[in-house]
């Protein structure tokens, strides 16, 4: 009997770990890997970036827990299922669903454009090749593989995420142990860089709502596949906490070398190059593949929002969205991130408000003796 209890706990822990890892994989993308997100949202506030990181950690923990938990208790297949059941199909619910849909559409396009520009910045920073060539190659790859629907390629590249996380942690530890200069000196240098938003607290909130805008639907679907809502909730909670810790580790790494990498479009790549140019080339390729993976996912999802997959209309929409993104990408990776990310983040607060309201609504539904699945 004791063995069975231990075995059950082991199985539960494994499922919690898998859900947590999947949540991290949904949120962590090429923007995080580049380090530019961390620089603008956290490091640019100097030592106060730690406080912003704590705010993000708390919010990511709550948001991760709620998204996966809601998916589980409602057996949801998408975010609209949850919104419909929470609002009872009222006009208010339809308005909220429409607003969330708008947020997701803008987020998909905005992220796609920023990532196209990021592909060019990657080439320029690492190899000295003009950014336009790196971006043009990215556009060609996105168009070709998007038309072929080579899912296996995307899955393989998606598996790079755990390796990337390990690399970031190792790089961060190295940077902290080799840090030169006092915290006060580094703080002054860090604060001289452009911030995405005006205050560290807003940065912590905006960064979470920015990422939730893209990760909400997938996280809910993931929760819908977990029968045990407690395991789902713990998995989302653990994933959110680990994600927050990764943010703070990355922030401290960039902060410790701000004089060396603060001016670079991809600070994390600069940190790796500082350790070894050979590792820098490897990291550059990994980031480029992650950018490709993100771009493909963004424009593919955007096109499927308006058309059916594998139709002539899909190919037309997909091509048009990608080419428009290519044209806008000439504004530059850093400038585009500074513009698009805060806007998407402010809009994404709508989703966080829904998640704060959700547990109270669920409790009320249960008190009325209604089945959550039959709503």
Which role fits each region the language model picked out?
Residues 192-193, 254-277:
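Membrane-interface interhelical connector segments
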Residues 52-53, 85-100, 161-176, 239-249, ...:
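Small-residue-rich segments of transmembrane alpha-helices in multi-pass membrane proteins
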Residues 30, 105, 131, 142, ...:
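Hydrophobic alpha-helical segments and their helix-loop junctions in multi-pass secondary transporters
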Residues 55-81, 249, 253-257:
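Juxtamembrane transmembrane-helix boundary signature
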Residues 16-26, 53-58, 98-106, 125-149, ...:
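Transmembrane alpha-helical segments of multi-pass small-molecule transport proteins
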Residues 14-33, 52, 104-108, 112, ...:
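Hydrophobic, membrane-embedded alpha-helices of multi-pass small-molecule transporters
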Residues 118-121, 130-138, 145-176, 337-355:
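Membrane-interface loop-to-helix entry segments
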Residues 14-15, 44-50, 73-107, 125-131, ...:
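Transmembrane-helix boundary/entry motifs in multi-pass membrane transporters
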């Amino acid at each position: 009997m004791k063995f069975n209890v231990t075995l059950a706990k082991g199985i539960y822990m494994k499922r919690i770990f898998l859900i947590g890892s999947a949540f991290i994989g949904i949120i962590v993308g090429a923007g995080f890997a580049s380090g530019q997100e961390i620089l603008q949202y956290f490091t640019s506030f100097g030592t106060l970036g730690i406080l912003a990181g704590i705010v993000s950690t708390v919010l990511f923990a709550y948001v991760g827990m709620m998204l996966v938990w809601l998916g589980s208790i409602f057996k949801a297949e998408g975010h609209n299922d949850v919104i419909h059941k929470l609002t009872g199909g009222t006009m208010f619910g339809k308005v909220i669903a429409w607003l969330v849909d708008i947020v997701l559409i803008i987020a998909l396009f905005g992220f796609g454009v920023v990532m196209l520009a990021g592909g060019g910045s990657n080439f320029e920073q690492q190899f000295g090749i003009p950014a336009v060539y790196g971006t043009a190659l990215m556009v060609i790859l996105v168009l070709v593989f998007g038309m072929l629907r080579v899912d296996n390629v995307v899955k393989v590249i998606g598996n790079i995420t755990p390796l990337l996380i390990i690399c970031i942690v190792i790089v961060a530890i190295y940077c902290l142990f080799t840090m030169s200069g006092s915290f006060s000196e580094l703080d002054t240098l860090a604060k001289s860089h452009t911030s995405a938003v005006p205050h560290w607290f807003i940065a912590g909130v905006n960064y979470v709502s920015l990422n939730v805008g893209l990760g909400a639907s997938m996280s809910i679907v993931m929760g819908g596949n977990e029968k045990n809502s407690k395991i789902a909730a713990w998995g989302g909670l653990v994933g959110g906490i680990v994600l927050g810790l990764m943010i703070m580790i990355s922030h401290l790494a960039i902060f410790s070398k701000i004089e060396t990498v603060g001016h670079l479009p991809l600070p994390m790549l600069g940190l790796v190059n500082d350790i070894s140019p050979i590792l820098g080339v490897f990291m550059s390729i990994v980031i480029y593949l992650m950018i490709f993976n993100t771009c493909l996912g963004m424009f593919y999802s955007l096109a499927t929002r308006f058309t059916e997959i594998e139709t002539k209309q899909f190919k037309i929409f997909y091509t048009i969205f990608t080419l428009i993104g290519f044209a806008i990408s000439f504004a530059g990776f850093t400038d585009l991130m500074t513009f698009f990310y805060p806007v998407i983040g402010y809009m994404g607060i709508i989703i966080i408000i829904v998640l704060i309201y959700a547990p109270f609504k669920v409790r009320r539904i249960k008190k009325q003796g209604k089945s959550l699945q039959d709503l």
